[in-house]
């Protein structure tokens, strides 16, 4: 059953009754939202002269900053004291975070008139005595430093105002009505104790509960956010409250909301677009040139533009490792406009290089104004320029050893300032339980409703034990107690409709149901949502759906030239093959992507190719150490001419050095039994498939011909090598196809030019005869040559895995015969015949572990 009137409506009648009796009252509510709503009710319904209605914090909040030192200044004073204390070493970032803790502790000691010496002897352990000595020295120095400013701290200033207001209330003999539920803190405790004879409490009733409560458990936090957005969309004509006190979760929820909303939680300024813009500028100023940092700035929504997107595309792939701004202007620009944009950008960002904090902050402001002339006119601009101005004036307190640490410090300071996004016309409001609990809504959404979120345990003080806090008589449990959470929950259940959500997983952890909800289930039957009602309908795509969870798309053509890796892609990921080879879509390596394993593999292949091809001319007569030095020197020369991060070059040099000796020995040993070796040799295999000529191309890393005419095709691998089963089943066909190329003289090697290609491609092996596939007998002259040069030869494929840790070289060899190769060739032909004929490409989630084209299907299946 729902309460007939809301708490505020009942309270409004109570106020009218008091006023009729001639009682002068001052009304204090927990927050400003309740004050505004109560005033609106009194004006609309009763049309009376309003009594004084204020939120509790308005009693002591007087914005006259000349009377007290700012929070930033106080943090810097404490930070300086902490860093000077040599017994416990702190860097600047650590000292600022500790300053926030000590600031609260020291202000509470002053407000409560407590001597810190009370805890001096409670524990005689060496650890505690060190902590106590640290606290006492910092406390005394802090008091002295504050007194020298001839001002109060903000907390003490507000407490003094509160005491003055208490005296005024007593003199006026005015009744104070405290209506609602207030969070416990030292200010409220003092107010209640001093004015207990003047205060009238008006508390809400807990006797009602809605008959429209539903529950759902989405799979993860993103599904929960989608459900919230969908529920809001379905109920856009209603007054909706989303109740949460977690800013991270709120951000996820808001990313999915299409409607306007009011935000009572607020965002710290570092999370706003302007805050992120300033932080990105400071990161660029305080660090060496880095394209990732540059595009972190340029992709900011406030300055992102078409030129940024073009520049990013131009700098993707290998250009993403450019290490200096001067190299940017040496690139080939598609037009003068983009070149001019890039030149202006370099001039703005990289002309000056300040070394002190004042210079960094001043330059940050100048750069921000050049990049966005209207920056301070934005929604948060006024607050941010005030913060920046204050920080510049206090920057003399920042003693920074390394300016690379300053971005973290700036971000931390910025996080202490809140910005609120409130829209009067919005029907959705997001806030904490204490902000929304006494308001009436058409729909309440309680997301992430679990014990961790709704029954948080009080966090232990980082410096003081529970016993020490008891001795000091300081209540640090500022978080809402478990009892208050119960009250809030019961009051929220009085609204018309309540939707309770609890994502099964968040941050990799399983969620558990909240105890409050479990107790509710004992008394009431709570229906579960039908998931179909919570999932937005998806637009059907013009893609053929199949029962085996495949998507199929049709092409009008099939390429005539394929690489051996294209064949593997066609087997493992047909849709990826279609996107790459037919649509011509190639993945670009993004600016922020680190060098990949494949990049390292390409580097090693270049080194080994250059060494191997020049071995007979330059290195054959050298001793082992000189050969090793030559190999390493080749790598250094290649790295010198390659655009890569300095740390990557160093790592690759270390890896190359690690396996160089083992590779030299491996190479020497294999050369002993070889009469011919071919390196990085190009090959091709020509086929006619269903009337279409197909050419398959590939490059063999190394082909060895032994003195006994045995042939081995080697492939160097710096990553994982395929299993024997993958090779046998044709899932990794690279070396198999290279063998087929070899048999058909696709590598143009003279040793295999004795037979005509057309005859070689169709041979079958019998006991004593060789016939072609059309049942024609091979020319006897060719048969003699073939038997001498091919039949007696042993064909082997070998994967050589190269690593920078022992064992440095691992070789996996597989012997092949003509029958096996013929079966693989027949399978290759059948594969190509299917795609050349049908031109139908399916996508299967289980075929490929690495898939750059998955998102192109625009359709996702959930595995059952």
Curated annotation (Swiss-Prot):
SUPFAM superfamilies: P-loop containing nucleoside triphosphate hydrolases, Restriction endonuclease-like. It holds the Pfam family PDDEXK_1. This is Uncharacterized protein RT0391. It comes from Rickettsia typhi (strain ATCC VR-144 / Wilmington).
């Amino acid at each position: 059953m729902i309460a007939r009137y809301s708490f505020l409506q009942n309270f409004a009648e109570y106020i009218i009754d008091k006023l009729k009796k001639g009682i002068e009252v001052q009304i204090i509510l927990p927050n400003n939202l309740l004050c505004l709503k109560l005033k609106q009710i009194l004006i609309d319904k009763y049309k009376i002269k309003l009594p004084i209605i204020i939120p509790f914090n308005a009693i002591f909040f007087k914005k006259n900053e000349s009377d007290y030192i700012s929070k930033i200044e106080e943090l810097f004073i404490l930070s300086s004291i902490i860093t000077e204390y040599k017994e416990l070493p702190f860097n600047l970032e650590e000292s600022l975070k500790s300053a926030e803790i000590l600031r609260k502790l020291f202000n509470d000691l002053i407000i409560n008139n407590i001597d810190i010496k009370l805890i001096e002897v409670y524990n005689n352990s060496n650890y505690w005595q060190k902590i106590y000595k640290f606290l006492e020295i910092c406390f005394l120095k802090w008091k002295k430093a504050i007194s020298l400013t001839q001002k109060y701290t903000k907390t003490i200033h507000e407490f003094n105002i509160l005491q003055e207001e208490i005296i005024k209330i007593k003199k006026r003999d005015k009744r104070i009505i405290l209506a609602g539920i207030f969070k416990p803190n030292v200010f409220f405790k003092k107010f209640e104790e001093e004015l207990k004879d003047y205060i009238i409490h008006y508390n809400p009733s807990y006797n009602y509960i809605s008959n429209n409560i539903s529950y759902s458990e989405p799979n993860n936090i993103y599904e929960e956010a989608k459900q919230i957005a969908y529920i809001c969309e379905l109920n856009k004509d209603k007054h909706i409250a989303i109740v949460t006190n977690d800013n991270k979760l709120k951000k996820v929820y808001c990313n999915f909301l299409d409607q306007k909303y009011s935000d009572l939680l607020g965002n710290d300024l570092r999370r706003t677009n302007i805050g992120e813009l300033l932080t990105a500028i400071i990161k660029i100023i305080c660090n060496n040139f880095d394209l990732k940092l540059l595009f972190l700035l340029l992709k900011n929504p406030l300055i992102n533009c078409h030129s940024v997107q073009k520049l990013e595309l131009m700098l993707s792939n290998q250009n993403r490792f450019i290490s200096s701004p001067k190299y940017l202007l040496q690139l080939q620009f598609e037009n003068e406009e983009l070149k001019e944009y890039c030149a202006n950008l370099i001039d703005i960002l990289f002309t000056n290089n300040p070394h002190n904090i004042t210079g960094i902050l001043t330059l940050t402001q100048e750069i921000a104004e050049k990049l966005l002339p209207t920056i301070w006119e934005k929604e948060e601009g006024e607050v941010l320029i005030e913060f920046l101005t204050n920080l510049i004036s206090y920057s003399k307190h920042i003693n920074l050893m390394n300016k690379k640490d300053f971005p973290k410090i700036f971000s931390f300071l910025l996080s202490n300032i809140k910005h609120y996004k409130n829209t009067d016309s919005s029907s959705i409001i997001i806030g904490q339980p204490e902000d929304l609990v006494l308001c009436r809504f058409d729909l309440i959404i309680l997301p992430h409703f679990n014990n961790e979120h709704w029954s948080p345990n009080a966090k232990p003080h980082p410096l003081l034990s529970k016993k020490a806090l008891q001795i000091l008589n300081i209540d640090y449990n500022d978080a809402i107690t478990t009892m208050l959470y119960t009250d809030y929950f019961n009051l929220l259940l009085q609204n018309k409709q309540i939707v309770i959500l609890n994502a099964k997983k968040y941050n990799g952890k399983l969620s558990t149901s909240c105890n409050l909800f479990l107790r509710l289930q004992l008394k009431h039957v709570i229906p579960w949502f039908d998931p179909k009602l919570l999932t937005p309908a998806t637009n059907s795509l013009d893609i053929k759906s199949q029962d085996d969870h495949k998507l199929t798309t049709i092409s009008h053509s099939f390429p005539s030239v394929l690489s051996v890796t294209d064949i593997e892609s066609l087997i493992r990921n047909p849709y990826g093959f279609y996107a790459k080879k037919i649509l011509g879509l190639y993945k670009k390596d993004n600016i922020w992507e680190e060098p990949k394993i494949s990049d390292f593999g390409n580097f090693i292949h270049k080194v080994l190719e250059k060494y191997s091809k020049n071995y007979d001319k330059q290195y054959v007569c050298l001793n082992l150490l000189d050969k090793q030095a030559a190999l390493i020197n080749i790598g250094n020369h290649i790295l010198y001419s390659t655009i890569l991060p300095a740390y990557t070059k160093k790592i690759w040099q270390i890896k190359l050095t690690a396996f160089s000796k083992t590779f030299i020995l491996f190479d020497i040993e294999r050369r002993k039994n070889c009469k011919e070796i071919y390196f990085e040799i190009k090959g091709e295999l020509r086929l006619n498939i269903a009337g279409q000529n197909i050419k398959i191309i590939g490059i063999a890393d190394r082909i060895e011909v032994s003195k006994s005419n045995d042939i081995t095709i080697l492939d160097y691998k710096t990553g994982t090598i395929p299993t024997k089963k993958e090779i046998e089943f044709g899932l990794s066909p690279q070396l198999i196809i290279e063998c087929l190329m070899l048999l058909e003289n696709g590598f143009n090697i003279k040793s295999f030019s004795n037979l005509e290609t057309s005859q070689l491609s169709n041979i079958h092996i019998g006991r004593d005869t060789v016939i072609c596939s059309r049942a024609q007998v091979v020319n006897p002259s060719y048969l003699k040559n073939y038997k001498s040069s091919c039949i007696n030869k042993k064909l082997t494929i070998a994967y050589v895995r190269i690593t920078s840790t022992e064992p440095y070289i691992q070789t996996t060899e597989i012997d092949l015969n003509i029958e096996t190769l013929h079966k693989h060739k027949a399978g290759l032909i059948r594969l190509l015949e299917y795609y050349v004929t049908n031109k139908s490409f399916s996508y299967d989630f289980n075929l490929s572990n690495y898939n750059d084209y998955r998102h192109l299907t625009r359709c996702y299946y959930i595995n059952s």
